[in-house]
Amino acid sequence: MSTIRGTLSELSRAADAFAHEVDEAGYGDYTFLPDNSPFDLSFLTSKGLEARGSLIAAAEKILRLAKGPQGCLASFADTKGIEMGTIQALTQLEVPDKVPLQGSITYEELAGVIRVAPELLQRLVRLAALAGFLIEDESGAVRHTAMSAVFLRDTAAGDTARFLFDVDMRAYSFFADSLRLDPSGQNIGDGPTALAFQHDSDDQGNRPTIWDILERNPIQRARFHSTMQALGSFPSHLLKHILVAHDWHSIGSLVDVGGSLGHASLVIAENFPEIRITVQDLPDVVERGRSSLPTVPHAERVSFQAHDLFQEQAIIADAYFLRQILHDWPDGDAERIVRCLIPAMRPGAKLLIMDIVVPEPGAISPYMEKYLRTYDVSMFSMFSAKERTVQQLRDLVERCSARLQFQGISCPPGSATSLLSWVYSAE
Protein backbone atom coordinates (compact mmCIF):
# COMPACT_ATOMS: atom_id res chain seq x y z
CA MET A 1 0.00 0.00 0.00
CA SER A 2 1.17 3.55 -0.71
CA THR A 3 2.72 5.73 1.98
CA ILE A 4 1.49 9.26 2.65
CA ARG A 5 4.18 10.77 0.43
CA GLY A 6 3.62 8.21 -2.31
CA THR A 7 -0.10 8.87 -2.27
CA LEU A 8 0.51 12.62 -2.35
CA SER A 9 2.57 12.14 -5.51
CA GLU A 10 -0.28 10.12 -7.06
CA LEU A 11 -2.73 12.85 -6.08
CA SER A 12 -0.55 15.60 -7.57
CA ARG A 13 -0.20 13.82 -10.93
CA ALA A 14 -3.91 13.08 -11.14
CA ALA A 15 -4.85 16.62 -10.10
CA ASP A 16 -2.68 18.11 -12.84
CA ALA A 17 -4.26 15.89 -15.50
CA PHE A 18 -7.78 16.58 -14.24
CA ALA A 19 -7.18 20.34 -13.96
CA HIS A 20 -5.85 20.42 -17.52
CA GLU A 21 -9.15 19.09 -18.89
CA VAL A 22 -11.17 21.41 -16.66
CA ASP A 23 -9.11 24.34 -17.99
CA GLU A 24 -9.57 23.18 -21.58
CA ALA A 25 -13.34 23.12 -21.04
CA GLY A 26 -13.28 26.77 -19.94
CA TYR A 27 -13.61 26.28 -16.19
CA GLY A 28 -10.19 27.44 -15.06
CA ASP A 29 -11.70 29.36 -12.13
CA TYR A 30 -13.79 26.38 -10.96
CA THR A 31 -14.52 26.87 -7.22
CA PHE A 32 -17.86 25.05 -6.74
CA LEU A 33 -19.97 28.21 -6.97
CA PRO A 34 -22.84 28.17 -9.49
CA ASP A 35 -21.45 30.92 -11.69
CA ASN A 36 -18.09 29.28 -12.39
CA SER A 37 -18.81 25.56 -12.17
CA PRO A 38 -19.83 23.02 -14.82
CA PHE A 39 -23.21 21.42 -14.19
CA ASP A 40 -21.67 18.00 -14.77
CA LEU A 41 -18.35 16.62 -15.98
CA SER A 42 -19.57 15.19 -19.27
CA PHE A 43 -16.82 17.10 -21.11
CA LEU A 44 -14.11 14.82 -19.70
CA THR A 45 -12.33 12.53 -22.13
CA SER A 46 -11.53 8.93 -21.21
CA LYS A 47 -8.13 10.17 -19.97
CA GLY A 48 -9.87 12.85 -17.94
CA LEU A 49 -12.22 10.30 -16.40
CA GLU A 50 -9.25 8.12 -15.50
CA ALA A 51 -7.49 11.10 -13.90
CA ARG A 52 -10.66 12.00 -11.99
CA GLY A 53 -10.91 8.47 -10.61
CA SER A 54 -7.25 8.45 -9.58
CA LEU A 55 -7.62 11.87 -7.96
CA ILE A 56 -10.64 10.80 -5.91
CA ALA A 57 -9.03 7.50 -4.86
CA ALA A 58 -5.80 9.23 -3.80
CA ALA A 59 -7.70 11.95 -1.92
CA GLU A 60 -9.70 9.31 -0.05
CA LYS A 61 -6.47 7.49 0.88
CA ILE A 62 -4.99 10.73 2.21
CA LEU A 63 -8.11 11.36 4.28
CA ARG A 64 -7.94 7.89 5.81
CA LEU A 65 -4.27 8.27 6.66
CA ALA A 66 -4.80 11.76 8.08
CA LYS A 67 -7.72 10.70 10.27
CA GLY A 68 -5.98 7.60 11.58
CA PRO A 69 -7.64 4.21 12.17
CA GLN A 70 -9.79 5.24 15.13
CA GLY A 71 -10.78 8.58 13.66
CA CYS A 72 -11.57 7.04 10.30
CA LEU A 73 -13.86 4.44 11.86
CA ALA A 74 -15.58 7.09 13.98
CA SER A 75 -16.18 9.25 10.91
CA PHE A 76 -18.22 6.45 9.28
CA ALA A 77 -20.35 6.04 12.38
CA ASP A 78 -20.67 9.72 13.25
CA THR A 79 -19.43 12.49 10.97
CA LYS A 80 -20.58 11.11 7.62
CA GLY A 81 -23.94 10.04 9.03
CA ILE A 82 -24.57 13.46 10.56
CA GLU A 83 -23.59 15.19 7.30
CA MET A 84 -25.91 12.92 5.31
CA GLY A 85 -28.77 13.42 7.76
CA THR A 86 -28.31 17.19 7.69
CA ILE A 87 -28.37 17.47 3.91
CA GLN A 88 -31.26 14.99 3.79
CA ALA A 89 -33.27 17.18 6.19
CA LEU A 90 -32.51 20.38 4.27
CA THR A 91 -33.55 18.68 1.04
CA GLN A 92 -36.76 17.23 2.46
CA LEU A 93 -37.64 20.65 3.90
CA GLU A 94 -37.12 22.02 0.35
CA VAL A 95 -34.49 24.50 1.48
CA PRO A 96 -32.61 24.40 -1.86
CA ASP A 97 -35.85 25.26 -3.67
CA LYS A 98 -36.39 28.33 -1.48
CA VAL A 99 -32.91 29.80 -1.95
CA PRO A 100 -32.76 31.93 -5.13
CA LEU A 101 -30.41 30.78 -7.86
CA GLN A 102 -29.04 34.30 -8.07
CA GLY A 103 -28.56 36.21 -4.83
CA SER A 104 -29.35 35.06 -1.31
CA ILE A 105 -32.02 34.83 1.40
CA THR A 106 -31.74 35.66 5.10
CA TYR A 107 -32.11 32.99 7.75
CA GLU A 108 -35.20 34.74 9.11
CA GLU A 109 -36.89 34.72 5.70
CA LEU A 110 -35.92 31.13 5.00
CA ALA A 111 -36.96 29.92 8.46
CA GLY A 112 -40.35 31.57 8.03
CA VAL A 113 -40.98 29.71 4.80
CA ILE A 114 -39.93 26.24 5.98
CA ARG A 115 -41.14 26.70 9.60
CA VAL A 116 -37.91 25.89 11.44
CA ALA A 117 -36.31 28.01 14.16
CA PRO A 118 -33.74 30.38 12.55
CA GLU A 119 -30.98 29.45 15.00
CA LEU A 120 -31.38 25.70 14.37
CA LEU A 121 -31.62 26.25 10.62
CA GLN A 122 -28.37 28.21 10.75
CA ARG A 123 -26.63 25.36 12.57
CA LEU A 124 -27.74 22.87 9.92
CA VAL A 125 -26.78 25.09 6.99
CA ARG A 126 -23.36 25.88 8.44
CA LEU A 127 -22.54 22.18 8.75
CA ALA A 128 -23.88 21.48 5.25
CA ALA A 129 -21.77 24.37 3.91
CA LEU A 130 -18.61 22.64 5.12
CA ALA A 131 -19.64 19.69 2.95
CA GLY A 132 -20.13 21.98 -0.07
CA PHE A 133 -23.93 22.20 0.16
CA LEU A 134 -25.15 25.85 0.46
CA ILE A 135 -22.97 28.67 1.78
CA GLU A 136 -23.28 32.03 3.52
CA ASP A 137 -22.48 35.25 1.67
CA GLU A 138 -20.64 38.23 3.14
CA SER A 139 -23.79 39.48 4.89
CA GLY A 140 -24.49 36.10 6.51
CA ALA A 141 -27.41 35.25 4.23
CA VAL A 142 -27.79 31.85 2.55
CA ARG A 143 -26.84 31.33 -1.08
CA HIS A 144 -26.26 28.36 -3.35
CA THR A 145 -23.15 26.39 -4.15
CA ALA A 146 -22.98 24.50 -7.43
CA MET A 147 -24.14 21.32 -5.64
CA SER A 148 -27.21 22.78 -3.93
CA ALA A 149 -28.09 24.72 -7.10
CA VAL A 150 -28.62 21.40 -8.93
CA PHE A 151 -32.17 21.35 -7.52
CA LEU A 152 -32.99 24.52 -9.47
CA ARG A 153 -30.88 23.89 -12.55
CA ASP A 154 -32.08 20.39 -13.48
CA THR A 155 -35.36 18.79 -12.44
CA ALA A 156 -34.24 15.21 -13.13
CA ALA A 157 -31.01 15.58 -11.15
CA GLY A 158 -32.89 17.19 -8.27
CA ASP A 159 -35.47 14.40 -8.32
CA THR A 160 -32.63 11.87 -8.18
CA ALA A 161 -31.29 13.39 -4.97
CA ARG A 162 -34.78 13.57 -3.47
CA PHE A 163 -35.46 9.93 -4.31
CA LEU A 164 -32.19 8.76 -2.80
CA PHE A 165 -32.77 10.79 0.36
CA ASP A 166 -36.43 9.78 0.72
CA VAL A 167 -36.16 6.08 -0.16
CA ASP A 168 -32.62 4.79 -0.51
CA MET A 169 -31.12 6.23 2.65
CA ARG A 170 -33.83 4.84 4.90
CA ALA A 171 -32.70 1.30 4.15
CA TYR A 172 -29.03 1.66 5.10
CA SER A 173 -29.49 0.99 8.80
CA PHE A 174 -31.46 -2.23 8.14
CA PHE A 175 -28.74 -4.31 6.43
CA ALA A 176 -27.99 -6.54 9.43
CA ASP A 177 -31.68 -7.00 10.31
CA SER A 178 -32.35 -8.06 6.73
CA LEU A 179 -29.47 -10.55 6.66
CA ARG A 180 -30.66 -12.13 9.91
CA LEU A 181 -34.09 -12.69 8.35
CA ASP A 182 -32.80 -13.77 4.96
CA PRO A 183 -29.12 -14.83 4.81
CA SER A 184 -29.41 -15.33 1.03
CA GLY A 185 -30.32 -11.68 0.46
CA GLN A 186 -32.77 -12.65 -2.31
CA ASN A 187 -36.16 -12.34 -0.58
CA ILE A 188 -37.27 -8.80 -1.36
CA GLY A 189 -39.95 -8.91 1.36
CA ASP A 190 -37.17 -9.24 3.95
CA GLY A 191 -34.85 -6.77 2.23
CA PRO A 192 -33.53 -3.55 3.79
CA THR A 193 -36.00 -1.33 1.93
CA ALA A 194 -38.97 -3.49 2.94
CA LEU A 195 -37.85 -3.30 6.58
CA ALA A 196 -37.35 0.47 6.36
CA PHE A 197 -40.94 0.90 5.15
CA GLN A 198 -42.57 -1.87 7.21
CA HIS A 199 -44.81 0.71 8.89
CA ASP A 200 -46.70 0.63 5.56
CA SER A 201 -47.26 -3.16 5.64
CA ASP A 202 -50.62 -4.40 4.35
CA ASP A 203 -53.39 -6.01 6.40
CA GLN A 204 -51.73 -9.43 6.08
CA GLY A 205 -48.46 -8.06 7.44
CA ASN A 206 -46.64 -8.16 4.10
CA ARG A 207 -43.92 -5.53 4.02
CA PRO A 208 -43.88 -3.22 0.99
CA THR A 209 -41.20 -3.89 -1.63
CA ILE A 210 -39.65 -1.07 -3.63
CA TRP A 211 -42.10 -1.90 -6.42
CA ASP A 212 -45.04 -1.55 -4.00
CA ILE A 213 -43.67 1.79 -2.81
CA LEU A 214 -43.39 3.07 -6.37
CA GLU A 215 -46.86 1.80 -7.29
CA ARG A 216 -48.50 3.48 -4.29
CA ASN A 217 -46.60 6.76 -4.48
CA PRO A 218 -46.78 8.51 -7.87
CA ILE A 219 -44.35 11.22 -6.74
CA GLN A 220 -41.63 8.72 -5.88
CA ARG A 221 -42.42 6.73 -9.03
CA ALA A 222 -41.87 9.84 -11.16
CA ARG A 223 -38.65 10.57 -9.27
CA PHE A 224 -37.44 7.01 -9.82
CA HIS A 225 -37.78 7.39 -13.59
CA SER A 226 -36.21 10.84 -13.42
CA THR A 227 -33.30 9.14 -11.69
CA MET A 228 -32.93 6.79 -14.65
CA GLN A 229 -32.89 9.83 -16.93
CA ALA A 230 -30.42 11.82 -14.81
CA LEU A 231 -28.08 8.86 -14.57
CA GLY A 232 -27.21 9.47 -18.20
CA SER A 233 -25.35 12.66 -17.25
CA PHE A 234 -23.10 10.96 -14.69
CA PRO A 235 -19.55 10.60 -16.12
CA SER A 236 -19.50 6.80 -15.79
CA HIS A 237 -23.04 6.41 -17.17
CA LEU A 238 -23.03 8.89 -20.03
CA LEU A 239 -25.42 7.89 -22.78
CA LYS A 240 -22.63 8.37 -25.31
CA HIS A 241 -21.05 5.17 -23.96
CA ILE A 242 -23.98 3.23 -25.45
CA LEU A 243 -23.11 4.42 -28.95
CA VAL A 244 -19.69 2.73 -29.01
CA ALA A 245 -20.66 -0.35 -27.00
CA HIS A 246 -22.20 -2.18 -29.96
CA ASP A 247 -22.41 -2.19 -33.75
CA TRP A 248 -25.82 -0.53 -33.95
CA HIS A 249 -25.57 -0.31 -37.76
CA SER A 250 -26.31 -4.05 -37.82
CA ILE A 251 -29.75 -3.53 -36.26
CA GLY A 252 -32.88 -2.35 -38.04
CA SER A 253 -35.43 -2.79 -35.26
CA LEU A 254 -34.86 -2.67 -31.52
CA VAL A 255 -37.07 -3.21 -28.47
CA ASP A 256 -35.85 -1.25 -25.44
CA VAL A 257 -37.35 -3.44 -22.70
CA GLY A 258 -38.02 -1.49 -19.52
CA GLY A 259 -36.67 1.56 -21.31
CA SER A 260 -38.26 4.09 -18.94
CA LEU A 261 -38.71 7.51 -20.59
CA GLY A 262 -36.74 6.52 -23.69
CA HIS A 263 -33.64 8.59 -22.96
CA ALA A 264 -31.26 5.84 -24.17
CA SER A 265 -33.35 5.01 -27.23
CA LEU A 266 -33.49 8.63 -28.33
CA VAL A 267 -29.70 8.86 -28.29
CA ILE A 268 -29.40 5.66 -30.34
CA ALA A 269 -32.04 6.85 -32.82
CA GLU A 270 -30.33 10.22 -33.20
CA ASN A 271 -27.01 8.64 -34.15
CA PHE A 272 -28.20 5.63 -36.16
CA PRO A 273 -30.93 6.70 -38.62
CA GLU A 274 -31.62 3.15 -39.83
CA ILE A 275 -32.97 1.97 -36.46
CA ARG A 276 -36.62 1.96 -35.42
CA ILE A 277 -37.10 1.52 -31.68
CA THR A 278 -40.00 0.51 -29.45
CA VAL A 279 -39.63 1.56 -25.82
CA GLN A 280 -41.56 -0.66 -23.40
CA ASP A 281 -42.43 0.12 -19.80
CA LEU A 282 -45.41 0.47 -17.46
CA PRO A 283 -48.45 2.40 -18.79
CA ASP A 284 -47.94 5.66 -16.87
CA VAL A 285 -44.23 5.67 -17.68
CA VAL A 286 -44.72 5.24 -21.43
CA GLU A 287 -47.42 7.91 -21.39
CA ARG A 288 -44.98 10.31 -19.77
CA GLY A 289 -42.27 9.30 -22.23
CA ARG A 290 -44.59 9.67 -25.21
CA SER A 291 -45.75 13.12 -24.09
CA SER A 292 -42.19 14.35 -23.64
CA LEU A 293 -40.84 13.17 -27.00
CA PRO A 294 -38.83 15.99 -28.56
CA THR A 295 -40.03 17.41 -31.87
CA VAL A 296 -36.97 16.32 -33.83
CA PRO A 297 -36.87 13.99 -36.86
CA HIS A 298 -35.18 11.06 -35.13
CA ALA A 299 -37.93 10.99 -32.48
CA GLU A 300 -40.35 9.80 -35.16
CA ARG A 301 -38.51 6.46 -35.17
CA VAL A 302 -39.07 5.96 -31.42
CA SER A 303 -42.45 4.66 -30.26
CA PHE A 304 -43.74 3.66 -26.84
CA GLN A 305 -45.70 0.61 -25.78
CA ALA A 306 -47.05 -0.43 -22.38
CA HIS A 307 -45.61 -3.81 -21.45
CA ASP A 308 -45.02 -5.94 -18.36
CA LEU A 309 -41.52 -7.43 -18.15
CA PHE A 310 -43.00 -10.69 -16.92
CA GLN A 311 -45.38 -11.13 -19.85
CA GLU A 312 -44.48 -12.82 -23.12
CA GLN A 313 -42.86 -10.49 -25.65
CA ALA A 314 -45.02 -9.95 -28.74
CA ILE A 315 -42.80 -7.77 -30.94
CA ILE A 316 -40.53 -9.52 -33.44
CA ALA A 317 -37.36 -7.44 -33.76
CA ASP A 318 -33.70 -7.66 -34.69
CA ALA A 319 -32.60 -7.06 -31.10
CA TYR A 320 -33.88 -6.77 -27.54
CA PHE A 321 -32.13 -4.32 -25.22
CA LEU A 322 -32.11 -4.76 -21.44
CA ARG A 323 -30.23 -1.74 -20.12
CA GLN A 324 -29.81 -1.74 -16.34
CA ILE A 325 -32.83 -3.99 -15.89
CA LEU A 326 -31.60 -7.38 -14.67
CA HIS A 327 -29.62 -5.86 -11.80
CA ASP A 328 -32.95 -4.83 -10.26
CA TRP A 329 -34.03 -8.45 -9.85
CA PRO A 330 -32.82 -11.58 -8.01
CA ASP A 331 -31.80 -14.50 -10.22
CA GLY A 332 -35.19 -16.22 -10.45
CA ASP A 333 -37.00 -13.08 -11.58
CA ALA A 334 -34.15 -12.07 -13.91
CA GLU A 335 -34.44 -15.44 -15.64
CA ARG A 336 -38.20 -14.97 -16.04
CA ILE A 337 -37.56 -11.63 -17.77
CA VAL A 338 -35.18 -13.22 -20.27
CA ARG A 339 -37.45 -16.24 -20.85
CA CYS A 340 -40.33 -13.91 -21.74
CA LEU A 341 -38.32 -12.58 -24.69
CA ILE A 342 -37.57 -15.94 -26.26
CA PRO A 343 -40.99 -16.62 -27.92
CA ALA A 344 -40.53 -13.49 -30.06
CA MET A 345 -36.93 -14.20 -31.04
CA ARG A 346 -36.11 -15.51 -34.49
CA PRO A 347 -32.77 -17.03 -35.57
CA GLY A 348 -30.23 -14.22 -35.74
CA ALA A 349 -32.02 -12.00 -33.24
CA LYS A 350 -29.79 -10.43 -30.61
CA LEU A 351 -30.13 -10.12 -26.86
CA LEU A 352 -28.20 -7.09 -25.59
CA ILE A 353 -27.71 -6.67 -21.86
CA MET A 354 -26.03 -3.51 -20.57
CA ASP A 355 -25.29 -3.64 -16.87
CA ILE A 356 -22.48 -3.16 -14.42
CA VAL A 357 -20.20 -6.20 -14.54
CA VAL A 358 -18.56 -6.93 -11.20
CA PRO A 359 -14.77 -7.37 -11.60
CA GLU A 360 -12.34 -9.56 -9.73
CA PRO A 361 -10.75 -7.70 -6.77
CA GLY A 362 -7.93 -5.44 -7.96
CA ALA A 363 -8.65 -6.00 -11.66
CA ILE A 364 -9.57 -2.35 -12.33
CA SER A 365 -8.78 1.03 -10.77
CA PRO A 366 -9.59 1.39 -7.05
CA TYR A 367 -12.01 4.25 -7.74
CA MET A 368 -14.03 2.34 -10.33
CA GLU A 369 -13.99 -0.88 -8.32
CA LYS A 370 -15.37 0.94 -5.28
CA TYR A 371 -18.00 2.61 -7.48
CA LEU A 372 -19.15 -0.71 -8.95
CA ARG A 373 -19.18 -2.51 -5.62
CA THR A 374 -21.19 0.33 -4.08
CA TYR A 375 -23.74 -0.15 -6.86
CA ASP A 376 -23.75 -3.89 -6.21
CA VAL A 377 -24.58 -3.48 -2.53
CA SER A 378 -27.15 -0.78 -3.33
CA MET A 379 -28.97 -3.34 -5.49
CA PHE A 380 -29.16 -5.59 -2.41
CA SER A 381 -30.38 -2.65 -0.33
CA MET A 382 -33.22 -1.61 -2.62
CA PHE A 383 -34.15 -4.69 -4.65
CA SER A 384 -32.62 -7.73 -2.88
CA ALA A 385 -30.79 -8.13 -6.20
CA LYS A 386 -27.20 -7.66 -7.37
CA GLU A 387 -24.74 -6.66 -10.04
CA ARG A 388 -23.26 -9.78 -11.63
CA THR A 389 -19.97 -11.07 -12.96
CA VAL A 390 -19.60 -11.96 -16.63
CA GLN A 391 -19.94 -15.64 -15.78
CA GLN A 392 -23.03 -15.07 -13.64
CA LEU A 393 -24.70 -13.17 -16.50
CA ARG A 394 -23.75 -15.85 -19.00
CA ASP A 395 -25.04 -18.62 -16.77
CA LEU A 396 -28.30 -16.75 -16.14
CA VAL A 397 -29.01 -16.16 -19.83
CA GLU A 398 -27.90 -19.57 -21.03
CA ARG A 399 -30.07 -21.32 -18.45
CA CYS A 400 -33.01 -19.72 -20.25
CA SER A 401 -32.17 -21.19 -23.66
CA ALA A 402 -29.27 -23.15 -25.11
CA ARG A 403 -29.99 -21.35 -28.39
CA LEU A 404 -28.73 -18.06 -26.95
CA GLN A 405 -25.08 -18.05 -28.01
CA PHE A 406 -22.73 -15.63 -26.25
CA GLN A 407 -20.99 -13.23 -28.66
CA GLY A 408 -18.87 -11.09 -26.39
CA ILE A 409 -18.60 -8.15 -24.04
CA SER A 410 -17.71 -4.51 -24.62
CA CYS A 411 -16.90 -1.89 -21.99
CA PRO A 412 -16.33 1.59 -23.45
CA PRO A 413 -13.48 3.58 -21.84
CA GLY A 414 -14.72 5.38 -18.74
CA SER A 415 -18.03 3.50 -18.65
CA ALA A 416 -19.31 1.81 -15.50
CA THR A 417 -21.51 -0.49 -17.57
CA SER A 418 -20.61 -3.15 -20.11
CA LEU A 419 -22.67 -4.46 -23.01
CA LEU A 420 -22.94 -8.24 -23.37
CA SER A 421 -24.47 -9.73 -26.50
CA TRP A 422 -26.03 -13.06 -27.45
CA VAL A 423 -27.40 -14.28 -30.78
CA TYR A 424 -30.41 -16.58 -30.98
CA SER A 425 -29.27 -19.50 -33.11
CA ALA A 426 -31.22 -21.83 -35.37
CA GLU A 427 -32.13 -25.17 -33.82
From Swiss-Prot:
The keyword S-adenosyl-L-methionine applies. S-adenosyl-L-methionine binds at residue 281. Pathway: Secondary metabolite biosynthesis. Pfam families: Methyltransf_2 (PF00891). GO terms for biological process: methylation; secondary metabolite biosynthetic process. Keywords: Methyltransferase, S-adenosyl-L-methionine, Transferase. The active site is at 327 (proton acceptor). PROSITE patterns: SAM_OMT_II (PS51683). It is an enzyme of class 2 (transferase). It catalyses: (1S,4S)-4-[(4-hydroxyphenyl)methyl]-2,5-diazaspiro[bicyclo[3.2.1]octane-6,1'-cyclohexan]-4'-one + S-adenosyl-L-methionine = (1S,4S)-4-[(4-methoxyphenyl)methyl]-2,5-diazaspiro[bicyclo[3.2.1]octane-6,1'-cyclohexan]-4'-one + S-adenosyl-L-homocysteine + H(+); (1S,4S)-4-[(4-hydroxyphenyl)methyl]-2-methyl-2,5-diazaspiro[bicyclo[3.2.1]octane-6,1'-cyclohexan]-4'-one + S-adenosyl-L-methionine = (1S,4S)-4-[(4-methoxyphenyl)methyl]-2-methyl-2,5-diazaspiro[bicyclo[3.2.1]octane-6,1'-cyclohexan]-4'-one + S-adenosyl-L-homocysteine + H(+). It comes from the Eukaryota. Its EC number is 2.1.1.-. GO terms for molecular function: O-methyltransferase activity. Belongs to the class I-like SAM-binding methyltransferase superfamily. Cation-independent O-methyltransferase family. Homodimer. PANTHER family: O-METHYLTRANSFERASE ASQN-RELATED, PUTATIVE (AFU_ORTHOLOGUE AFUA_4G14580)-RELATED. O-methyltransferase; part of the gene cluster that mediates the biosynthesis of the alkaloid (-)-FR901483, a potent immunosuppressant that shows efficacy in animal models and a probable inhibitor of purine nucleotide biosynthesis by targeting phosphoribosylpyrophosphate amidotransferase (PPAT). Within the pathway, FrzF methylates the phenolic oxygen at position C4. The biosynthesis of (-)-FR901483 starts with the condensation of two L-tyrosines to yield (S,S)-dityrosyl-piperazine. This is O-methyltransferase FrzF. It comes from Cladobotryum sp. The gene is FrzF.
